[in-house]
Amino acid sequence: MELIDKIKMSVKDLDLFYGDKQALKKINMDIKENKVTALIGPSGCGKSTFIRTLNRMNDLIEDVTIKGNISVDGEDIYTSDDVINLRTKVGMVFQKPNPFPMSIYDNVAYGPRTHGLRDKKQLDKIVEESLKGAAIWDEVKDRLKSSALGLSGGQQQRICIARAIAMRPEVILMDEPTSALDPISTLKVEELIEDLKKDYTIVIVTHNMQQAARISDETAFFLNGEVIEFSDTKTMFTTPVDKRTEDYITGRFG
């Protein structure tokens, strides 16, 4: 019997406007649990705008209007006022590593402390588990009190991933998490993403076609604020349905 993948997030008829300018048009997408979904497309196509709707980061921008429905486990994220709880459940890792100017330990403990956790044993456990989960524990375990700003770019990005998973999210959003990293650091983060999907649902924006092909289970191709094609990654990269998808992934435009 074929197992049916559980839908973790569902997007229905999503429109987004910046003032009068429409940036996203009628987006429909089911994001499967414990899978990596890649968002690809040329610069300015709407993929970063889209990923930020998934944990309401666009709420911070003035003059934004959002129509349609986005749900996590069947619950509409835009009908609740509890944005903090949403961002606990749906974590985010940004393009440029952005560790806080504090120790490695305090970076990872920041979220749990903000939510009221003060017990040192529990914090120690969360910090260690999160750093192990982000595949950086062995590199930093002897210098947890050192500043996170003293780490390499690749290490800083893994600290940011550890900081995200310290909140025990269910979904991790990644907006071009390796674009500022060297090839070796990129490979480490890609290996980490492959490992993380056992416990988390991951949505990643990437400009790198090879990266999308390597690490994702499903891929959505965005163009001019629309999803042109959304399918399992192997199908998209071998037998795309839409000519525009084929033109993009073969490098005819971008």
Curated annotation (Swiss-Prot):
Organism: Clostridioides difficile (strain 630) (Peptoclostridium difficile)
Quaternary assembly: The complex is composed of two ATP-binding proteins (PstB), two transmembrane proteins (PstC and PstA) and a solute-binding protein (PstS).
Stretches assigned to the ABC transporter domain: 9-249
Gene3D superfamilies documented for this protein: P-loop containing nucleotide triphosphate hydrolases
Gene this chain is encoded by: pstB
UniProt protein name: Phosphate import ATP-binding protein PstB
Chain sites annotated for binding ATP: G41, P42, S43, G44, C45, G46, K47, S48
Membrane protein topology class: Peripheral membrane protein
Subcellular location: Cell membrane
One GO BP: phosphate ion transmembrane transport
Stored SUPFAM superfamilies: P-loop containing nucleoside triphosphate hydrolases
Lineage, broadest ranks: Bacteria, Bacillati, Bacillota, Clostridia, Peptostreptococcales
